[in-house]
Amino acid sequence: YRTYETPGDAVRNATRLVEAGADAVKFEGIKPDILDALRKEGITVMCHIGLNPQHEQEEMKRGRIARGKRLDEAARLIEGAALLQAHGAGLMILEKIPEKVSKIITENLGIPTIGIGAGKYCDGQVLIVHDLLGINERKFKHCPDYIDHRAMMITAFARYRREIDGGIFPAEKHANIIDDAEYRSVVEWCAASGYTV
């Protein structure tokens, strides 16, 4: 977040990531100037269009999540995807775009598209792990209810607390045990060294 406000910021931060072992970087939005600067440095770039969750938190809170449902938005996304490909994008992430619009984008690009809530016509799919595992309280239309880890975690934490409060945990089976003879040696050493046992 806020690591690519200018082309210089983008290059500086992306270079650090690549030096640390990243194979590529990703940024949100239709920003050919940022893409040009990164590609000039030989950095592989994945672009992310549609919903830009790092920059649109307030709109998301108001419930406006899908992008491309109106002609002007759909046209901007289709043209933006083509523009980013022309500037060297290696992959396009399409987030919360209507399935039919994602199909048009995918069919008009020569690079892979990865959808997150963008329908079945993308070349691949991705979900946020917290959504996939049901860890977040908020549920999203594009993510099936595979499992409710949130409820499982709440149950586990409540049990953990009850067992601590009730003196059940930790039990002897959870403790590391020292040999009696070795412990006597520790006690003798403590006495000789001024430690209370």
Short names for language-model regions:
Residues 1-197:
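Alpha/beta enzyme core
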